[in-house]
A protein has these predicted regions:
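Selective recognition of signaling/oligomerization transmembrane alpha-helices
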Residues: 165-168
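A "functional boundary" signal
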Residues: 1-163
Length: 168
């Protein structure tokens, strides 16, 4: 029953995010362009989004905006199936989040998933643990739900790996 409620909560959150993205009036030009780049990605125009994001980065935006730009780059590269570039952009975002002491984020957990898929269980485990701790710290329910869905898989794999290494 909890999974059904969590899924409904997540679906409702995504629906509202889309509604706000469509109707938001942004006073900051950089923020407006980031939202436009997101729309291009959703519309299957990742290349156009990448061009726009490169232009934004060339303007030396503030650190928090840089994090959003790199995260949006990661979404564009995901759309294009360029996993290595997606990982690189998520790592950039995670570093910027760390520098700004941001605790409510998606980048580190997405990075953990991708690293796990590539077989880097140790880093995936560390990053997901950090994501879980930060989600609890700032009471970010959606982030906690997202991490909690995947954590048991990485945790089990990590513990099996640790167990095997004791016997070698």
């Amino acid at each position: 029953e909890m999974d059904v409620l969590d899924d409904l909560f997540e679906q409702e959150y995504q629906k509202k995010t889309q509604q706000y993205r469509d109707s938001i009036t942004l006073t900051n030009v950089t923020d407006r362009y980031i939202v436009e780049a997101e729309k291009y990605i959703i519309d299957g125009k990742a290349e156009k989004a990448i061009e726009m994001l490169n232009e934004l980065l060339s303007r030396n935006p503030e650190q928090r905006q840089q994090a959003f730009i790199h995260y949006t780059f990661s979404e564009a590269y995901k759309d294009r199936g360029e996993t290595d570039k997606q990982i690189s952009e998520l790592a950039q975002t995670a570093l910027l989040d760390l520098k700004s002491a941001t605790k409510e984020y998606a980048s580190l957990q997405k990075l953990a998933y991708l690293l796990y898929d590539k077989g880097d269980v140790d880093r995936a485990y560390k990053y997901l643990n950090c994501s879980m701790d930060d989600a609890v710290f700032c009471n970010a329910r959606l982030r906690f739900i997202e991490v909690a869905k995947f954590f048991p898989i990485i945790d089990k794999t990590y513990k099996l790996k640790e167990e095997r290494s004791k016997f070698i």
